[in-house]
UniProtKB/Swiss-Prot annotation:
Underlying gene: ift172
One Pfam family in the UniProt entry: TPR_IFT80_172
One GO biological process term: photoreceptor cell maintenance
Localization per Swiss-Prot or TrEMBL: Cell projection, Cilium
Name the UniProt record assigns to this protein: Intraflagellar transport protein 172 homolog
Native source organism of the sequence: Danio rerio (Zebrafish)
Amino acid sequence: MQLKYMKTLLTPQDGAAKVTCMAWAPNNAKFAVCTIDRVVILYDEQGEKRDRFTTKPADPKYGKKTYVVKSMAFSPDSTKIAVAQTDNIIFVYKIGEEWGDKKVICNKFIQTSAVTSLVWPSEHAIIFGLAEGKVRQANTKTSKSSTIYGTDSYVVSLTSNVSGKGILSGHADGTVVRYFIDDEGSGESQGKLLTHACPPYALAWGTNSIIVAGCDKKIVAYGKEGNVIQTFDYSRDRAEKEFTVAASSPSGQSIVVGSFDRLRVFNWSPRKGTWDESSPKEIPNLYTITALSWKKDGSRLSVGTLCGGVEMFDCCLRRSIYKNKFEMTYVGLSQVIVRNLSTGTRVVLKSQYGYEIDEVKVMGKDQYLVAHTSDTLLLGDLVSNKLSEVAWQGSGGNEKFFFENETVCMIFNAGELALVEYGSNDILGSVRTEFMNPHLISVRLNERRQRGVEDNKKLAYLIDIKTIAIVDLVGGYNLGTISHDSKIDWLELNETGRKLLFRDKKLRLHLYDIESSVKSTMLSFCPYVQWVPGSDVVVAQNRGNLCVWYTIDSPERVTMFPLKGDIVDLERSNGKTEVIVNEGVNSISYTLDEGLIEFGTAIDDGDYYRATAFLETLEMSAETEAMWKTLSKLSLEAQQLHIAERCFAALGDVSKARFLNETNKIADAVAKEYDGDGTDHYQVKARLAMLDKNFKLAEMYYMEQNAVDEVMEMYQELHMWDECIAVAEGKGHPELDNLRRSYYSYLMETNQNEKAAEVKENEGDFTGAVNLYLKAGLPAKAAWLAMSKDELLSSQDIVSRITAALIKGEFYERAGDLFERTRNNQRALECYRKGNAFKKAVDLARVAFPAEVVKLEEVWGDYLVQQKQMDAAINHYIEAGRSIKAIEAAIAARQWKKALHILELQEDRTAAKYYLKIAQYYASVQEFEVAERLFVKGDHIKDAIDMYTQAGRWEQAHKLAVKCMTQEDVSVLYVSRAQELEKEGKYKEAERLFTTVDEPDLAITMYKKNKMYDDMIRLVAVHHKDLLQETHIHLAKELEAESRFQEAEYHYLEGQDWKAAVNMYRVNDMWEEAYRIAKTHGGANAHKQVAYLWAKSLGGEAAVKLLNKFGLLETAIDFAADNYTFDFAFELARLSMKQKIPDIHLKNAMFLEDQGKFNEAEIEFIKAGKPKEAVLMHVHNKDWSNAQRVAEAHDPESVADILVSQAKFCFDQKEFQKAEAFLLRAQRPELAIKYYKDAGMWTDAMRICKDYLPSKLSVLQKEYESEGNWGVEGMIEQAQEWEQTGEYSRAVDCYLKVKDSSNLDLLLKCWMKAAELAIKFLSHDKAVDVSQIVGPRLIQLRKYNEAAELYLNLDLIKNAIDAFIEGEEWNKAKRVAKELDPRLEEYVDKRYKEHLKNQGKVDSLVGVDVVAALDMYAERGQWEKCIDTASKQNFKVLHKYIALYATHLIKEGEVEKVLSLYIQHGVPAYSQNFNIYKRMFQELVNLRDRDCAEAFRMWSDLRDVLLLLCENLTKSSEANSPAHEEFEQMLLVAHYYATRSAAKGIDQLSSVAAKLSISLLRHTELIPADKAFYEAGLAAKAVGWENMAFIFLNRFLDLADGIDEGTLDALDHTDFQDTDIPFEVPVPSRLHVTVEKREEIREWVLTVSMDQRVEQVLPKDERGTYEASLVAASTGIRSLPCVITGYPVLRNKIEFKRPGMAANKDDWNKFLMATKTTHSPECQDVLKFITQWCGGLPSAGYSFH
């Protein structure tokens, strides 16, 4: 967050005139400032002063200067301002929405003390604080106020959280209290939150924490529950003053704190979870800041000062311009203001959850906002200002957004479509789809309201390219799935989401009704389709027609207009709908019938009167008729019967219109009598049910009212006599018989004999029924009735009449049934045969005429064949034994398997003829093996071979042929057949035959002869692979000879000889083809070579054009030159690239040089502008004269180089004089010197140098000296010479250069001589430099004394001391330091200590540095030496190392050694040792198997150490501290353990030992609980206290289970209620008892609980309390514990000198007696300890009082 000064709103005054308060309006349009003179000034958004008003006192009589305005706030709607005043009142002023509106006081709230602060978080609730400490709420609706909470401390500040649902109040005593109007599910606490170190005048509530500051110059950040997160301390900064005010940004992620001349800015870092301080805004002469107010969009901060100034600052993290259209101002991590630069409109985009906004984009024709945070996605509509924030997990920014729909944003990501409705913070719905085209998705959200539908949100999309799914987004369920047979390319729901239009790739248009799930095709060809906005009318184009469906419920009703062009658009505005058609250049509009569209809309809106009125204006047409039908249906459903009557009248449905007219009369009469519309009357409801043909429902309505006659009348009118009679029967109607008679008469009158017969049958008149059935021409029914009634069968007359009628009517089967029932089997069989009822005939024959069965089966088979039921006939022929017929039937029925099965069962050869037919079938279905078998069986082997041949299965044919023919015959047959096929042009078949008889060469020859080279090559590849390439080349050459170049090319390439193909085309001047092949198949440069040859063949301009076309001109020139075709290269260069000519000359010159044509080469070099190359050529050939000539003529600069080259040559030839002359001519004396030096001719070099370069003589001399390989003697001689001539510096250098490792004495002598000369004759600095060289060399040779002496001669004291130290001459080093530079004594000592440490001479180190020595002992683990040495030092040093040793021992698990260490050396009351003492105690009480007499010494030592510690603590500053009390408790526990060990050794004290174990249970906060209960249980069990043993051991088992689980939360404390045994104890890290012992205890506890002999209750004493509890359950009085048993001391007590120490007389006497009788040293030790601890024993002896 950066604060940037914008402008001064109110100029500061010279003196104090503070701005008391300020407030920004929630709508960001107004800013209010209250000055010291109690005037409220109003500014606009830009900071321009627009209005002002004066505040009023609570009582006018007190005047205007009797109060101060402390705080003010705008109402949430920005039309009111609440003003808090110190004269105990709050005024609410209505300021209006416009500037200059009259200011009116609309509320006032009088209080009992001054109002100090105020906020207005919600519509009618103002929260304010009072000087008396109360925080109250004022309701502007009721003008009443009430107290929310009260404190006793002045309210200094009040603030709300970001949402305004939570309030913080700061009080003068430092208290900060929190109150929630609504905690928004956070679960945070209310009430006192924290206490700050000073009054929290600066109080701000950020998103994640609370910032508090005040006069102590500290800014503290507190967490959500008042814990300190961070502290910013400026108390040491003298420039800082007290903090007076704080303000949080609207997002809560930045907080500004004001002080003197300074604003401190803090920004919340979500990643770190802390506040980061930005660089403070320092403004000299601003003085103390008294008020801060942040604009609600976060973009401005206003600052009020002590001198009455108001400054405005711009607040932003960053600002950017997007697409030069929008300004993005990031006012916080989670808030961005987006401003349209052209219109000035603004939208505040904010993350409601406080997430950091990454980047904001404006998309969808600059109308929609999209932004990401880490966990959410922000969307917004800039036009409607609807914003959304939905949960969105990071997808790497790969989403695609579609904004085609104005109400919903479609987001496509990784195959999933999500829909977000603008203004909603939830994802509307998401579905899986791969098709993210707006034309393949349709969303409709409440676009047209329907009757009775609140929320209508539908989605249609593609599941796959042929399947549409329709989803209800409100309920989240599938409304339907449409599977289509073709790909779908467009779909759209209507505005109500009830109909779906879709079009497929074949341009067929379909309509799907979602409610009925009916799909109908509307057009077979449709390039354009669209719903008319605001209606259910569809407009589409079908080739040359404009199609309009005004009533979509009747898709067949379509209005068509011819048109010439294509529909391009549909426009609906100003009550007019036009279809725009593009007819070539012109656009023509076709106006739709708005009235028809109006009808559809009226229907959808449920306004049927409006629809009727509209239809009455239209003439009757197909469309109008469809609309009347729709209206009639809907009005009936809505029970608007008058409209329905009008509709049926219009449709000409007179009967329905009359029926409805009568119904309406009934309804009107009812309505007149009873009010309402009369449609609920039973007659109306019944008539409507009749109209709907639901007669049962109508009957129900009548019967509910017991209107039986009306039901009967209804059924009679409808001639539904059966139903009428049923009603009469059900109700026992008196007219029932008459009704039946009337019904029969009616039937007879209307000649309904069948129905009359049924009535007779129902009445039991079967003879009459039979007569009537016969009369009605229904003999079959008469027969059924006769067969069901035996009395009719007994009448011969009736049976003969019925059978005669049946035979006459050709109902033979029924006649047969009747004859069979009357035992007339012969007639029955005849009838069955006549009626073709063969099954019944056969069944009857099996019983009555067995001989006829076989005949009947054959006849049955013949009948079935006649009926073409061949399949059914087969079995009957088999039954009749007619196999041939059966085979023929099976073949006719194409039951080939059955036919084959029957055939194979035949032994007779007459059936063999059928093999061929069946075999031919199997051959036709390509079941060749079966067919072959049948052909062979039927002696048709030739047919089998032909079958295989035709099927191309030559191998099988061959195999078959071989079986019945010789190999030669087969081959002759196959070859001759193949040749025939060849003649017929069936080459493939011929090939198959050739290859079958192993004659592939014949096939190859055949293909070659017929020039079928592909097939020829294929066979060669299979049968002669080694000849394949050769064949390709051979064919290619043949084809080339025939000028079939393309085919030849193919074979050359297949033969891997692309060069031959290129050459073929080149020879035939087909350069394009040659170039193509070279480029495709040649290497990287092949095509370039072909292009080059092509160009060369063309020559001149044509060549240049060609090469330019391929971009190879320069390459070609280079290639020509490189291949020595210089004429062509020059030709190309001259025509197109003159700049290349010199290069070609140069290459030509090089070529000529290589050819030895030097003169021609020289000319070419000069033409190339490279005379130097010509010179170098002559120089290379040692042709110095020509070189000189060319150089002088063309390159004078090279003359000198020639002379140098000539000189070099002469030097090599040892002609030194010539060489020198040449070099001096070339003016290169330095080269002469170099060559002489290289030749070792130093004299000549010196001479030349002296004559021509005297300035370099000295350097040469030095070089000569350094380079001269003189040897050691030569060096020394030279040095002595320098010395004699007084050149001491050179002499020194010479001596120092001497390096002869074989003669160390000589070396030493030389170096010492150098040092001596330096000291004597050279300057001090030079001498020091020499000593710095010689000294280290001497030290290296271990000549420490000589080195030190050298340093001392030059007063280099420290170097001398270092030399002595290097040689471990410590005494000399100390002496030098002491005598020459006492400051270095400490340095020597330090080095000496380091030396001792490094050498490990600790014993020597003790004398020098004890602490260092002790540390070293400790490091090495030499603890005995360490402690022994430390004991000779002071007490503190000793205990420091004892503490270190103790810590080491505890880590190693040797805690008993720690105890003996403190026994030996005492326990000082050092607080830093407390943890060691506690750890020692814990480790000792955790030890296993210490519940015995043998452990007495350990426990007594622990007890004595703790006693000594407590005594030392009493004398120290830690007396009576919590630590002291804790050690007293440990002492008591250790005493109990020691006493218990003593008692364990004596049988008569077993009860004392048990009591001590039980008393230790109250100390389970210090000792392991499981161990304590285990030991107490065993002790109680040992002395027979089974109740206690059971309870304690049971508790032990519960604890053990808890330790295994890691928690003791599940423990039941019932047994220990009203005892002093603690419930809350630490969970031991491990079990202190072995698994075996634990299982033993578990078995004992189970046994006891099963026996039920022990009551699970702890024993109680006279107090009614558990006997070992110190605290009485009823009174809460705490008794003293007995020093012997730990049990409470009640009546018989012995008191000791030390207060609070007592014993039970009985226990004391018992212990004393046992001690005396046994002389136990342990018991005596206990008594001695009690004397020491409790201040003396009472007089010895028994007490019997």
